[in-house]
Amino acid sequence: MKQPDCRLILVFPKTLEENMVEHVLQHPELAGGFTTVEVEGHGKGAVYHSITEQVRGRVRRVRMEIVMACDDAHTLIDHLKEALPTPEIAYWIAPVLEFGRFA
């Protein structure tokens, strides 16, 4: 396995969670594992799916984080863009200075 040197963060609507998880799991050679958590977001790109979200000014989202090799992150992004082309999926890549396990 390549040395992980970046963190891919994906934020997307809860309705896309199963599709996103399925697509990431189809590429174990790129992403060995990931973490998901429910979050709320707001901003110019937010699409409000309910009256409640419009009133609150926030949208429910899922945040997926994957620590991986940067070249694999770009490959995975390409796969996801092709499989799930929507402006409702945001991503960014951040450097990882060190990654390990306690045992």
Question: What are these model-predicted stretches?
Answer:
Residues 1-103:
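Positively charged, small/polar-rich N-terminal and surface patches that mediate targeting and assembly
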